[in-house]
Amino acid sequence: MQNPTQKVISFSEHKADIERIKKEIEEGWAIVKLVPNKDRFIGLLEKISDPKDETIYIPPRKKIIMN
């Protein structure tokens, strides 16, 4: 079975959720679509082949700080 190239995510603004999404981005996933749904966000992550060659979309007013 192949590894997925896209996956659906759901998260809130809680620190644990943000850390989980931050880890996904560090592992080479990019947020390609993100919509608010009450107190959560529903989105689509897409695996990027070479993170250095691709841009990563971060939605307006949402900052994910990578140290």
UniProtKB/Swiss-Prot annotation:
InterPro entries: DUF2674. It comes from the Bacteria. This is Uncharacterized protein RP158.
